């Protein structure tokens, strides 16, 4: 028993004994703290202890040779008060840069398994000891009560992507704890009103927003998005309003608990493709000083591969790195009750040590079958910066879903009126069956989205033809050039009544399409009230009104907000949209694709009208069938549309018609009944009809 352990040695003035070699990181145990860390090529490891915020360690405890088994160092240090110390490591070993081995015993090394990193609590403030990261032991005790995870079916997910700081940092958010986990918690009633059932938080692992700090034209620029991870086991302390030492992470747990209590799942955007250490010119604070040639993909002469576009690439399928990633995800699932993960540039996770794509990557397979991660949602951004594009072909083992980039691209182009896209758009709406075999993966593998953090907001997509990224400081060369956007007749904000009305209609068309598509849905926070980034499609460095949500727009664009609420509720109400795999009792196909002529899917080059019908057994009215028709006319003029015939006694009732502004949402007591199954659809509009029995 741990409580019976006694010291066996004295090192550096501390009573110690060999530690628990299976207990990674620094962990409070009875009588002291257990420290464990691994290095293959080091010849010496020293534990450094600091007083809070001190620059120089007050104690150096070199691990005795007997405290090393294999490549693992472990020591239990007695008498430490976890509140009164911080720690780091020093490693000594060979310096052979041509082999990628670059030990420097003068460097303070951050524990990769650290649960909290000090000196990061004040957003936008440079560290007192720049480039030096120290860790703190965390009290992980938290009472989850009777709270259980929602465990929603994948196909029912309506994911709301947000940035923790940007979501509430603007004064218009009305919250007390702006830009923090607590600020999101204050907005839970809003999320409930909107109707989403999952949030996807952009990176929350510890990162240093000052890591790429610079000044451009008097504007301070930061690593705002947080995709350069400093520590993978520690939540970003600058996202916490309560900075009580030894309890880091408690505020995030409270947020997760309250979201779960309200039926909302939590998905984390995680970055295992690279780290904040960069390339040969980058900082040196963790993996570089432990086993640089193991943790990173290196060229034969010891340089860094750069498939991430960020300076280095984690060697994800190396067994040690693979185990590290698995340990990390298990920790977030067990300690924070996280429901799912979206993996940034996930195709890198399928490359071997020299960057060659693998058929069956060990890491991806181990994550798919790990028992702790069973039921956890795994979502891949199925491409990388090295040219590997795997949408529709990402190794899945029927467990991995994908951000469907083809859905985004095809629907953006189709909705703005491009030709030769009707068939592709119809495939995307009906679950991308050409990409995801319904008999194997199915549409659950397709996370559909039209907007996300990377690119234009939905409002900007219909307000700008070109990106406007000058504020980023790269002379407008950064960010994608091919946005498939359309400004509707004027670049940026305008007082033109017709253009503004058209923009609102296009926004509604896009969101209605997303809500009537098969597969999990994702949209960007703020799209529901026309949030703008003023044409910036790469706001990674903008900690200001460019990236912060402007909540005053919720009232200004109240009709858009109400439309989003209605469409989310509609999708939830009619389950056949999200789960139409069963057969309807009247032998209608679960999904059928139409043109402006019912039961005809002959699309020509100039076809810009799609009709989709979902049919299935009603879950609410026993013995009845359910029919939903979604039609989109991307043409700029009227098109006469014939809806499919229905069983005897059923008729089509119109619920949505964006060509009928401002009454585009038709109240149920005023629904238009299409007795002749025909409607003259306005240009650039969508309709949604429900087959009901009278």
Annotate the PLM regions.
Residues 1-160, 165, 186, 191, ...:
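Carbohydrate-interacting/catalytic domains
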Residues 48, 98-103, 171-175, 203, ...:
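Short, solvent-exposed loop/turn and secondary-structure capping segments
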Residues 87, 91-146, 209-229, 281-303, ...:
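Core domains of carbohydrate- and sulfate-ester-processing enzymes
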Residues 114-117, 337, 353-354, 359-525, ...:
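Conserved alpha/beta catalytic core and glycan-binding cleft of carbohydrate-active enzymes
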Residues 158-160, 199, 266-268, 341, ...:
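Hydrophobic faces of well-ordered beta-strands that scaffold small-molecule active sites
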Residues 163-182, 186-338, 345-369, 435:
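Substrate-binding/active-site clefts of carbohydrate-active enzymes
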Residues 171-185, 464-469, 663-675:
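Short, polar loop/linker segments at the starts of domains and inter-domain junctions
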Residues 202-209, 270-279, 345-350, 380-386, ...:
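Short, solvent-exposed turn/loop segments enriched in Gly/Ser/Thr/Pro and often Arg
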